[in-house]
Amino acid sequence: VSVDNRKINFANGPRFIGARRADRSLDQFYNHDDEKAKEKDRTYSEFPDAAVFTKLDVKEDGGNLVVTANYKLGNLDKAQWTINPSGELALDYTYNFSGVVDLMGIRFDYPEDQVISKRWLGAGPYRVWQNRIHGTQYDVWENDYNDPIPGETFTYPEFKGYFGDVSWMNIQTKEGTISLTNETPDAYIGVYQPRDGRDRLLYTLPESGISVLNVIPPVRNKVNSTDLCGPSSQPKWVNGPQTGRVIFRFM
């Protein structure tokens, strides 16, 4: 993305991201046929998206430029960008998924080492998990970049993770500001992914960059897998198309 002759390396999206706990079989339950399943209950396997780009449509609509990318044979179906004269970009996207999933949505890439801070209107100041939604408050929050390790460092609130009820979020970087307005009800904004400690006793999550997620993972404890952490920790059964809308501004 270029802004006033400056380059903001926000790219490679939208791309579908979907993952489930690596010890699961296709029916969500523990995979007894896998001899190494027990070793995988702290890791997540990402679904490869076989989507193939088929067509690009470009048209003008009321002074706006509308660019639609169409895909087939995979999860991502369509990404429609509406660009207005001020440089605001509205993304309407559609993807499909049928099956059991612990993490699902769309993602973009941005180099983490360029991030300075974030400010957002939404639930905060803490990140959430599927089984730890409650306890946040809806307000304007702000924090500097940090990358704490549970049990080893005590920097709070954590910068990275999944954030709920986000109306808008501004991510300040060394290259400029990435601003997004979330118009997808019940979607979460993912800011990279939480990092586990040295021994990886809790989770090893797939890299998700800056993401808009319909499903976020639960968190386990050191003893029990997520299956044993209550009803809110169970994976989601998803079937059919999923749609969303997010507006980007780059400053």
Please tell me what each predicted stretch does:
Residues V1-M251:
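Beta-strand/loop-rich accessory regions of lumenal/periplasmic or secreted enzymes
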